[in-house]
């Protein structure tokens, strides 16, 4: 893989920070790293290649980017999913706090119990997002 520098100081020869998700590239327009090098291929090729090489991959599972995209478009139907994501201690704190940030784009008032859960979270990033 060709080297790419992230944040000015972090040269890498990998796919970046996440596993390629050609399905999200098609539905949300997210960057698709495989076809940046394999310029003679398209996203459909990438999807088939990942499926063939990694049959047990989680590439078909729901991804938080779908909720974030919906909230960014003002789609209030994402609210319940964002609250569930923010409550899920099994996902990274940055994702949880980002879910809270996206809630501000679409939510009216949240139940005080919801916010108070986040204010007492062990992670400072989550607590900080709850205050904002």
Name each model feature, range by range:
Residues 19, 84-86, 99:
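Active-site-adjacent structural elements in folded domains
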Residues 38-41, 89, 107:
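Sec/Tat-exported extracytoplasmic proteins
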Residues 76-87, 108-120:
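Amphipathic alpha-helical scaffolding segments comprising HEAT/armadillo-like alpha-solenoid repeats
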Residues 90-92, 122-124:
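Short inter-helical turns and helix N-cap capping residues of alpha-solenoid HEAT/ARM repeat scaffolds
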Residues 1-68, 73:
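Sequence context surrounding c-type heme c attachment/ligation sites in exported
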């Amino acid at each position: 893989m060709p080297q790419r520098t992230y944040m000015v100081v972090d040269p890498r020869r990998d796919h970046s920070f996440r596993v390629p998700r050609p399905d999200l590239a098609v539905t949300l327009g997210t960057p698709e790293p495989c076809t940046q090098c394999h310029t003679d291929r398209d996203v459909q090729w990438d999807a088939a290649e990942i499926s063939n090489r990694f049959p047990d991959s989680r590439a078909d599972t729901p991804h938080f980017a779908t909720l974030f995209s919906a909230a960014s478009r003002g789609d209030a139907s994402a609210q319940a999913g964002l609250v569930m994501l923010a409550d899920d201690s099994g996902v990274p704190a940055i994702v949880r706090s980002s879910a809270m940030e996206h809630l501000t784009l679409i939510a009216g008032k949240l139940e005080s119990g919801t916010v108070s859960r986040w204010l007492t979270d062990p992670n400072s990033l989550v607590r900080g997002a709850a205050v904002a």
